C-alpha cells in the first residue's frame, strides 16, 4: 500500500492540484469523516482524516453512453467490466495520466491496520487505492511522458464515406510511410527489421507540410474531406527513454501488432483494424468501429 502525502488545503499549490484533478473527476475535499456511501473515499493519515468525494457514476454516465441507464446502486465492479482495465483484482482508470488503481478485498480489518491508506466501501467489500497521484515538490521535465505514435500511413476520405463504413469493410491506405510522431508532431521515422524490432531515427527538421489551402464551395457538409490516420502503435515515453532507443536500443513490437491498428479521424480514435494486403497496395480491415450513424 503506497503512503499518501498529507498536505495543507490552504496552500496555493494544493488548490491548483485539486482543480486539475477536478477536470477528470468531480472531487471535493472535507475534514469531516463520512461513511456509508460508495462514492465517498476516506483518506486516513497520521495528520488527520480527509474525505474525497469521487462522483464516479456521474463521470461514467457523462463519459460513456452505455452507463446512462445505470442506477446509483450498481457496484463499481459491475461498471469495471466495460470501462476499467482488469488485471486480477486491480482496476485502472485509463483517463488519468498517473493512474489510480483499486484493490478489492472482503477483509475489512485491513482498514484499521495501516496509518496511511485509501479506501471506500462497496457491496463487495472494501476497495483500496493501491496507487494515487501525489503532489510533487519538483518535476524533472525529461521524465514527463510524451505520446509517441508509430504511424504507418494515412488516407483522405469523405465524411459521407466514413458514415457508411461497417465492421469488416476495408479502408485503403493511400499514403504509406513510417513516421514517428511525438505529441502529434513529426520528429523522425522508424525502420522495422525481420524480428519485428523498430530502429528509431530522429530528423533534424520536420520538412515541408503536405497540407495546402484549397478553396472549396460547400454544398453538403458530408463532402468535407477528413484525414484518416492509421497508427501501428502508441507509446508513452520519457525523453530519457527516447534517447536510449535513438542511441543504441531497438524498440520491440508485439508479434501481432498488424492486427491492432488504431484508426484516427482528425486525431480522434474511431476504430481498430488489421493491416491487410490488397491488390496494388494495403488496406485496413475494420474490426471495431465507433462512428455514429
From Swiss-Prot:
Source superkingdom: Bacteria
Gene3D superfamilies named among the record's database cross-references: SpoA-like
SUPFAM superfamilies (UniProt xref): Surface presentation of antigens (SPOA)
Keyword Isomerase (UniProt): no
Keyword flag Ion transport: no
Pfam families the record matches: FliMN_C (PF01052)
Keyword set, alphabetical order: Plasmid, Virulence
Gene Ontology BP term (one): protein secretion
Outcome of swapping residue 143 to S: In plasmid pMYSH6000 and plasmid pCP301
Family listed: Belongs to the FliN/MopA/SpaO family.
Protein role: Required for surface presentation of invasion plasmid antigens. Could play a role in preserving the translocation competence of the Ipa antigens. Required for invasion and for secretion of the three Ipa proteins.
Name of the molecule in the record: Surface presentation of antigens protein SpaO
Protein source organism: Shigella flexneri
Gene for this chain: spaO
Amino acid at each position: 500500500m503506497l503512503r499518501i502525502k498529507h498536505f495543507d488545503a490552504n496552500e496555493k499549490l494544493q488548490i491548483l492540484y485539486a482543480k486539475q484533478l477536478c477536470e477528470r473527476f468531480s472531487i471535493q475535499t472535507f475534514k469531516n469523516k463520512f461513511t456509508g456511501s460508495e462514492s465517498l473515499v476516506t483518506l486516513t493519515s497520521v495528520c488527520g482524516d480527509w474525505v474525497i468525494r469521487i462522483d464516479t457514476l456521474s463521470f461514467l454516465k457523462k463519459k460513456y453512453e452505455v452507463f446512462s441507464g445505470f442506477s446509483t446502486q450498481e457496484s463499481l465492479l459491475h461498471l469495471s467490466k466495460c470501462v476499467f482495465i482488469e488485471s486480477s483484482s486491480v482496476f485502472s482508470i485509463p483517463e488519468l495520466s498517473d493512474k489510480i488503481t483499486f484493490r478489492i478485498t472482503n477483509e475489512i480489518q485491513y482498514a484499521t491496520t495501516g496509518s496511511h491508506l485509501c479506501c471506500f466501501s462497496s457491496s463487495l467489500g472494501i476497495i483500496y487505492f493501491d496507487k494515487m497521484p501525489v503532489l510533487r515538490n519538483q518535476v524533472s521535465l525529461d521524465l514527463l511522458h510524451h505520446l509517441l505514435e508509430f504511424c504507418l500511413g494515412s488516407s483522405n476520405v469523405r465524411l459521407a464515406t466514413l458514415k457508411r463504413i461497417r465492421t469488416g469493410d476495408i479502408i485503403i491506405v493511400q499514403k504509406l510511410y513510417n513516421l514517428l510522431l511525438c505529441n502529434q508532431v513529426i520528429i523522425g521515422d522508424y525502420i522495422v527489421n525481420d524480428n519485428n524490432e523498430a530502429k528509431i531515427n530522429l530528423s533534424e527538421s520536420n520538412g515541408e507540410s503536405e497540407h495546402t489551402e484549397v478553396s472549396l464551395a460547400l454544398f453538403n457538409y458530408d463532402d468535407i474531406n477528413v484525414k484518416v490516420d492509421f497508427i501501428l502503435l502508441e507509446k508513452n515515453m520519457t525523453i530519457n527513454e527516447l534517447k536510449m532507443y535513438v542511441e543504441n536500443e531497438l524498440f520491440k513490437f508485439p508479434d501481432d501488432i498488424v492486427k491492432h491498428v488504431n484508426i484516427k479521424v482528425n486525431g480522434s480514435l474511431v476504430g481498430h483494424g488489421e493491416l491487410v494486403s490488397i491488390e496494388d497496395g494495403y488496406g485496413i480491415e475494420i474490426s471495431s468501429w465507433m462512428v455514429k450513424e
